[in-house]
């Protein structure tokens, strides 16, 4: 059985993949409390299921490997007003738990840069 994490709003309440991945981890932790033989999902596992795992359904997507479609978000977590110096992995984790569209500075789909959605809407910066 192949499982992935997707953002089908009809089946959930947000198209934000970072929030869907975090919710998957949280729900798996609750499940693990009642089913000791089923370990909780880790954030790296959820990240895989939301990226490269999706390729099991949609083809060569979800990875920066040669031959894959370049679909990516460029995120900036430096505006969070953090007191700590964080590694790239820690910044990615921070985006999954605390980030939103204000942290996304560029979007790419099939190698093409996408325009910012709703550019006329100016949101208050975090921090």
Please state what every model-predicted region is.
Residues 1-81:
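His/Asp/Glu-enriched, well-ordered alpha-helical/loop segment
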Residues 13-14, 85, 125:
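Short secondary-structure boundary/hinge segments and terminal tails
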Residues 69-119:
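C-terminal cap of metal-dependent C-N hydrolases
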Residues 117-127:
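Intein/HINT protein-splicing elements and their conserved insertion hotspots or analogous self-processing inserts
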